Every structure is written in C-alpha cells, then in structure tokens.
Design a protein with these regions (language model features):
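Secretory-pathway ectodomains
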Residues: 1-300
C-alpha cells in the first residue's frame, strides 16, 4: 500500500478546510429580511387591524406579522414575522398570502406550509405609508398614524387572478406588478411629470388594475392636464381612458368597473376584458360596438 506524503495530504486538507469554512459561513448567515416562523405562544400575536382572510382550514390575520389560526377551533397555529417590521395588510393571490409591511416590503407566503416564496421592495412605498411631511402629519396621534398606514397599505396592494395570480403595488410615484409564482417583476410605470397616481381611488378586476392619475401641471397651451385612468394587465398592452381629475372607480364584478365622472359626464361602465367602455343602452352605436351592455342600464 502506498503511503501518503505530506505533500499529497495537503490538497485533501485544503478541501476540508474550504468545506468547513463554507459550512460555518452558511450556519452563521443572517436570516434574509429578518424572516422567522414562530410556534404558538412564542410571541405576542395581538392584531394590528381587524382584517382576516380564510384559506383552506386557516384563518389568516395581520399583526404584528402574518398570524395563522385554525378556523374550527380558533387555535393559534403559527406566526410569520420579520424583525423590525410590522405587517399592515394581506391579500390572497391564488393560493398565496401577499403581505404589505410598514418598511415598504411585499412578501408572498404559502399558508399551507408557511413557506416564504419571495420578497420585493417597492421604492417610495414606506414613505407614502407613513405620510411623513404631508400636511397635518406633525399633529396626528399614534392611532391616526396607524389608521393612515392601514388604509394606504390596503390601497397599495391590488391582487389579480387572471391570466394567473399577480399583484400590482401602487404608490403616487410608481406602479409595479409582480407575478406571484416567482415574484418576477412584470412591469413598472411612472406617471407623467407633475402628475401622480392615486392608490386610494384604484380598483382591480379579475384581470386588470385601474389606476387614476391627477396632475398639477399644464400642457404646452397652458391648459391643465386632464385626469386619466391607466388599465394595467399582465398579458396584454395597457390601455388609457380619459377622465376628469376627480373620477371615482367602483368594482362591479370580475370584469367590469363603474367609472363615476361627476354629474355632467355621469357614470359609465368599463369592460376590463375588452378594454373599452360599454355603450349606453338605447344608443344608436350599440349594434356596432364590440362591447355590448350587460344587464340593465339607463337610457341616454
């Protein structure tokens, strides 16, 4: 049997040292984004808001992380937390629970095994949630600040199910869309200069997100820029709809939204599959329209 010389032993030792160092580094690697899953009773699970969602045999609640309870017994099963961050709002995107955190992070969690699927940071989201520097911010109570955060978090996160689950995250300066199955950024959009998106007036259908904008500037002729609604979709070009600066949107069903543009123009119905307004019932244009009126509607 050939004996090993000191020189021949060195490469093997080097490999072992490298593997050992790698294992030690992996063992001491910080948990990404402060993630941790706690068993019942490990940490306080007092709710941040009254929001709850049911999925499978679980009831999911917000605060201070994503809290899971047994629907039948009410037993607290697990908590998903992030160090230094508080969960504000959750929505289901397919089988995933998508959470908005107060530090501007968006997280997708699979409730069935509390696996964290992806994290995405949205620029400017945390600042908008806090409303720092806005009129009246210095005089708000802690309760008012938290209520503002909760309202804005709910408006920012817009879940969509078609053609596959995805979410849009809307802030005044930016709209981003993430595909849920892998967290892939599908698009991002910014409004024109001197304009801003309005998350609080934004609505979603099953296949699109409708985002109004408002503008403070004017065009080259000095006239104020009009309001506008942008329709964002995952699998098709976006569309634009002219509207007044104070237009209000209301979801009617999975593929239609009401566009309330004030007493002069009135309320119209928008089809988010066709990307077009439904014609008014009784209008001469009805036979030639691609989008037909659905149900009953008022005569012109």
């Amino acid at each position: 049997m050939r004996s090993l010389s000191p020189r021949s032993v060195l490469p093997g030792l080097a490999v072992l040292l490298v593997l050992g160092a790698g294992a030690a580094a992996h063992a001491n690697k910080p948990v990404p984004f402060g993630d941790r899953v706690d068993e019942p009773g490990v940490a306080d699970a007092s709710p941040v808001s009254a929001q709850s969602l049911a999925t499978g045999n679980l009831e999911l609640r917000v605060g201070p992380g994503l809290e899971a309870y047994d629907q039948a017994t009410g037993e607290h099963l697990w908590s998903y937390r992030r160090e230094g961050a508080t969960a504000l709002h959750l929505a289901m995107a397919g089988e995933s629970a998508v959470v908005v955190w107060d530090d501007g992070m968006i997280t997708s969690v699979r409730p069935s095994d509390h696996a964290v699927r992806w994290h995405r940071a949205v620029p400017g989201l945390a600042d908008w949630l806090r409303a720092d520097g806005e009129p009246g911010a210095d005089t708000r109570t802690d309760t008012e600040r938290r209520d503002t955060e909760l309202e804005r978090a709910a408006a920012a996160l817009q879940p969509v199910t078609e053609p596959e689950p995805w979410v849009a995250v809307v802030t005044p300066a930016l709209t981003m869309a993430f595909r849920d199955r892998d967290g892939d950024l599908r698009f991002n959009a910014r409004p024109l200069a001197d304009c801003s998106y309005d998350p609080l007036r934004t609505v979603h259908s099953d296949n699109a997100v409708l985002v109004p904008r408002s503008c403070t500037g004017g065009n080259s002729a000095g006239r104020p820029l009009p309001g506008l609604i942008t329709g964002f979709r995952l699998d098709a070009p976006n569309w634009l709809l002219n509207a007044g600066p104070n237009v209000l949107l209301h979801r009617l069903d999975g593929h239609r939204a009401a566009v309330d543009d004030g007493p002069v123009i009135g309320t119209r119905t928008f089809d988010t599959v066709q990307g077009a307004l439904e014609p008014v019932c009784g209008s001469p244009a009805v036979p030639f329209e691609a989008v037909k009126p659905e149900g009953t509607c008022s005569k012109p």
